[in-house]
Amino acid sequence: MFKILKQVGDYAKDAAQAAKYIGQGLSVTFDHMRRRPVTVQYPYEKLIPSERFRGRIHFEFDKCIACEVCVRVCPINLPVVDWEFDKSIKKKTLKHYSIDFGVCIFCGNCVEYCPTNCLSMTEEYELATYDRHELNYDNVALGRLPYKVTQDPMVTPLRELAYLPQGVIDPHDLPQGSQRAGEHPEDILERLQAEKQQETADQ
């Protein structure tokens, strides 16, 4: 009799322990189910880089004085500055400037120490190419302004992983209505069109 009761008690204990383990596993599953999706459907969705994102370097040819400070502060002496001395004005004249982004580590030293602010970091990160030599940007390619993600009506910009409310480090607990801090591209276009029509009507 006592043996049967002991077996029943052990069975109940094992069943309770199994239910506990199942509950722990399901709690993790349900926790992930209530979270918002973190998968980015690239290239139809793109993350908006943060304000201090260090992307492709933008170069302004007219501001450069060929001082070569960027070359001296670069850990790998990467920028190629081609200049000649103009005896008539007794100054250096810049002829060519290039940076190989296949080697660049995007440390930002050149931007920080440039005395004329002719270098700046952009939010452009799509530098993939089939030929590594195409990553060697000359002054013309470096002078091209980047195309912002927020200006592309065919792409949905995802802001929640770049811009979060103060004190929030986990985007999963935000309300469902705050998935995007900004507007959808189609809403932006409609708003701009409405503002343009309003300005036309006021005139």
Swiss-Prot record:
InterPro entries: 4Fe4S_Fe-S-bd (IPR017896), 4Fe4S_Fe_S_CS (IPR017900), NADH_quinone_OxRdtase_chainI (IPR010226), NDHI (IPR004497). The keyword Hydrolase does not apply. Binds 2 [4Fe-4S] clusters per subunit. It is a peripheral membrane protein. [4Fe-4S] cluster 2 binds at residues 74, 104, 107, 110. Its EC number is 7.1.1.-. NDH-1 is composed of at least 11 different subunits. NDH-1 shuttles electrons from an unknown electron donor, via FMN and iron-sulfur (Fe-S) centers, to quinones in the respiratory and/or the photosynthetic chain. The immediate electron acceptor for the enzyme in this species is believed to be plastoquinone. Couples the redox reaction to proton translocation, and thus conserves the redox energy in a proton gradient. This is NAD(P)H-quinone oxidoreductase subunit I. The lineage of its organism: Bacteria, Bacillati, Cyanobacteriota, Cyanophyceae, Oscillatoriophycideae. The gene is ndhI.
